[in-house]
């Protein structure tokens, strides 16, 4: 996605501040906006959903972006700029995972109590971050890997995790019981793996006159909710 029209960036104070900050840091405003949206969504409680306009299920706010750019073009810098704008994401872990099974383990774990295992919430939110798309492709291409389909399940807020005979390792997180965002940095040569998608955030910027702004953006404080509201 690209937003070359100044009318878009000037339509809201927050958008203008994002663009000004990105330009002052010599990074793409489009990429900074995309990651900023991810961070704001990560801080949003999982019980906040979209209305069921199609079918009977709610829509999820879970979100993912791909930052596209050549080596050294500032993909990581754009990620860092968004972090400076929205530093508080409610203690959400920011990490990559090597398998689909590990995703559910970010949100919950089985603990033994009185001889029985129960599911305990570790965190209601998480950000999956892959600084190189080649790493994500390698992990997804591994034999019997379910990483990619499990990541796709995140975007619609579906139940994640598998039920196994080993109750200690059986971690399933209910639908809309977690908040997840995904940020992947990719070089143009890697875009083939995302060709089924609808778009990506460009890391290029035509602006050439950097200027400095002050202040930061934050989201209102909210009470921490369980990742298993149902």
Outline where the language-model segments fall.
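Phosphate-handling catalytic cores of nucleic-acid transaction enzymes
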Residues: 1-230
